[in-house]
């Protein structure tokens, strides 16, 4: 709507009249200036206010303009107030446009029809783009290919990047400009944006489990802040590490690694992925076959990290997240419908699922639990936890016996997964180990929360590393309180 038109009569209020005079006087001089410049003319403006105070404006020199005026004897146009009022009345009666916009706008049937058409087009557009109203359209596919041992596809990002685990259930193919967006038919949403964040107890920035959704976006966005805490409002769907040497773990085979220097955070939409963890199973899952990676210690970018499947619903004696309530059982749900949406990885260099009969009965054989790989810097007891009540068998090729060595992804083999072979030898350490010297390879970055680690192994460079994928859970409360559950030791390395 235009400006409100006032009635052209004398203003009775003295203050209001003074304000109006000041504004309109300047407006009149501004119009005179514009006219003089646009049309190359000379203008002299003389104003006396109600108290006989003089205000004047001249485009050039007032005396020259007044001299011209007094010497001018030709017939010319001369207007007074009555002439202007008469001209304005004629314009309004003829239906011509007034210099000022009208105060009220009348809707004619033609304009109402236009508005209806615009509204219909807008509704149709919103209906067609309901899937992703704020994002580019997604190409959904039910197969996920995550090369977890390929050196060219996976690489360490710059310090400050956060770790994101690959291969979420029923996820879609990753495009370079889009994040993992699940098909809405088989996925559920379980968001607790106000859930408290739990920092690691080692004093340095370790792995942290943010709220309840699991998401794998690519590209830099809102992520962990530098003090080891995750902003639950900015990135409520992030599973990542806030340490200085975290590992960007999610790469499609054809898209480049995420840009370094920024966290792999959320873009603008949260995909509705969740993993539900049933709390009942107490047994321990068997350790799995390990894989040997033949590449030098200095140049190996990333290999399969250790996966420990524990339940956060177990009593948290001796664990880092001692404040984690048992209500987290319902926050991560991995149902059979979600699991059956994924196919197993079968090509070499990929994770392939063992078709265990227990999983086949529950239609869980197709879901790679590598979707919850928790690599990077995990503190004590902070391994990402899943309880499926079934034995899980994941095999990788070539097969080699498990060895208690650091994997190239910065983890050591979880010795608590093999209690029948090696009892935990070390006493509990109440304080975290001091940082080792700089310049070590990523292999020496972290010792896992439950492995016995000999310092002499650190000085033994090897060209091959085995990368165990261990799926298991501490069998009883003694293992949870045993010396094997200790604080992790953190080293920095130069990438």
UniProtKB/Swiss-Prot annotation:
Residues carrying N6-acetyllysine: 249, 395
Positions of crosslink type Glycyl lysine isopeptide (Lys-Gly) (interchain with G-Cter in SUMO): 395
Record keywords, A-Z: Acetylation, Activator, Apoptosis, Developmental protein, Differentiation, DNA-binding, Isopeptide bond, Neurogenesis, Nucleus, Phosphoprotein, Transcription, Transcription regulation, Ubl conjugation
Compartments where located: Nucleus
Gene assigned in the entry: Mef2a
Listed result of changing residue 395 to R: Abolishes sumoylation
One Gene Ontology biological process: cell differentiation
Comp. bias (Basic and acidic residues): 455-465, 476-495
A matching Pfam family: HJURP_C
Gene3D superfamilies: Transcription factor, MADS-box
Record text on subunit structure and interactions: Binds DNA as a homo- or heterodimer. Dimerizes with MEF2D. Interacts with HDAC7. Interacts with PIAS1; the interaction enhances sumoylation. Interacts with HDAC4, HDAC9 and SLC2A4RG. Interacts (via the N-terminal) with MAPK7; the interaction results in the phosphorylation and transcriptional activity of MEF2A.
Protein name, entry field: Myocyte-specific enhancer factor 2A
């Amino acid at each position: 709507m235009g400006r409100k038109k006032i009635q052209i009569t004398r203003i009775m209020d003295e203050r209001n009249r003074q304000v109006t005079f000041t504004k309109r006087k300047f407006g009149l001089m501004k119009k005179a200036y514009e006219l003089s410049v646009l049309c190359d003319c000379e203008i002299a403006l003389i104003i006396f206010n109600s108290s006989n105070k003089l205000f004047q404006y001249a485009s050039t020199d007032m005396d020259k303009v007044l001299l011209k005026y007094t010497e001018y004897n030709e017939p010319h146009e001369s207007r007074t107030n009555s002439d202007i009022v008469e001209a304005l009345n004629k314009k309004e009666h003829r239906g011509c446009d007034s210099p000022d916009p009208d105060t009220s706008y009348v809707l004619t049937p033609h304009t109402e029809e236009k508005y209806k058409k615009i509204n219909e087009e807008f509704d149709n557009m919103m209906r067609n783009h309901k899937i992703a109203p704020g994002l580019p359209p997604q190409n959904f596919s039910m197969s996920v290919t995550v090369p977890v041992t390929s050196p060219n596809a996976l690489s360490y990002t710059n310090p400050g990047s956060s770790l994101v685990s690959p291969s979420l259930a029923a996820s879609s193919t990753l495009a370079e400009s889009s994040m993992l967006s699940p098909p809405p038919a088989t996925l559920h949403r379980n968001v607790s944006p106000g859930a408290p964040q739990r920092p690691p107890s080692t004093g340095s920035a370790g792995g942290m489990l943010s709220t309840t959704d699991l998401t794998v976006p690519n590209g830099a966005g809102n992520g962990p802040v530098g003090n080891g805490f995750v902003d639950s409002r900015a990135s409520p769907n992030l599973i990542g590490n806030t340490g200085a040497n975290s590992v960007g773990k999610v790469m499609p085979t054809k898209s480049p690694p995420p840009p370094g220097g920024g966290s792999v955070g959320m873009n603008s939409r949260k995909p509705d992925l969740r993993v539900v963890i049933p709390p009942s199973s107490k047994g321990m899952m068997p350790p799995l076959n390990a894989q040997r990676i033949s590449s030098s210690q200095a140049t190996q970018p990333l290999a399969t990290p250790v996966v420990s499947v524990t339940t956060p619903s177990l009593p948290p004696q001796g664990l880092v997240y001692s404040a984690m309530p048992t209500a987290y059982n319902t926050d991560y749900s991995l149902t059979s419908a979600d699991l059956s949406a994924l196919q197993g990885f079968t090509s070499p260099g990929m994770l392939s699922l063992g078709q265990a009969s227990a999983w086949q009965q529950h239609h869980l054989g197709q879901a790679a639990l590598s979707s919850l790989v928790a690599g990077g810097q995990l503190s004590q007891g902070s391994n990402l936890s899943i309880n499926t009540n079934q034995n899980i068998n994941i095999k990788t090729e070539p097969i080699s016996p498990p060895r208690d060595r650091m994997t190239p992804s910065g983890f050591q083999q979880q010795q608590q997964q093999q209690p029948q072979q090696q009892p935990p030898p070390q006493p509990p350490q109440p304080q975290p180990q001091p940082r080792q010297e700089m310049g070590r390879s990523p292999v020496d970055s972290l010792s896992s929360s439950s492995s016995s680690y000999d310092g002499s192994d650190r000085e033994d460079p090897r060209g091959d590393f085995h990368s165990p994928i261990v799926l298991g859970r501490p069998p009883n409360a003694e293992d949870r309180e045993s010396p094997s559950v200790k604080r992790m030791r953190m080293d920095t390395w130069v990438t």
